[in-house]
Regions:
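Short amphipathic alpha-helical patches
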Residues: 32, 52, 56-60, 124-128
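Short, flexible active-site loops
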Residues: 8-18
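Glycine-rich phosphate/pyrophosphate-binding loops
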Residues: 37-46
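Glycine- and charge-enriched low-complexity intrinsically disordered segments
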Residues: 112-131
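...with weaker cross-activation on analogous glycine-rich loops/strands in unrelated enzymes
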Residues: 45-109, 115
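Short, structured interface segments
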Residues: 1-9
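Residue-level marker of positions within ordered structural domains that often coincide
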Residues: 33-34, 97, 130
Length: 131
């Protein structure tokens, strides 16, 4: 079993309680990038229920924050998902061997395997230019 242990424990990445806009999937990605790569991603002020309003916050991730789409993921790549939606509405961090770190709505942040559940919602992997 692959075990991910964050480098810094001042802001634990695993076991967080969910809170929209403060402790959610994107804040987990931001904190991972800050702790693991010393890269500070900009915050996004998500509008509540944005994915059902047709807003596409993750669509411009590449141009806005320095990410490029990649085919073969490596540790630290952002993985994006469309979960019961027409726009990408969930993100996580690829760790290793199909294991990713994420924070789903109303759950605690955790590591999970992309298979069999999450792979059907995955849209793409994105790599930061400085990671």
């Amino acid at each position: 079993k692959y075990e991910y242990i964050p480098k810094k424990l001042n802001n634990p990445l695993l076991g967080r309680q969910y809170s929209f806009g403060t402790l959610d999937c994107y804040s987990l990605v931001r904190d991972f990038y800050s702790q693991e790569f010393n890269i500070n991603l900009s915050s996004i002020n998500f509008e509540d229920d944005w994915w059902n309003l047709g807003l596409d916050y993750f669509g411009d991730l590449g141009t806005a924050f320095g990410f490029v789409e990649v085919e073969q993921p490596q540790k630290g790549d952002v993985v994006l998902f469309k979960v019961f939606c027409n726009v990408e509405n969930h993100c996580g961090v690829y760790l290793k061997e199909d294991i990713f770190l994420h924070h789903a709505v109303n759950r605690i942040s955790c590591r999970e395997n992309l298979y069999p559940l999450w792979i059907k919602y995955k849209t793409r992997f994105m790599r930061h230019a400085n990671s």
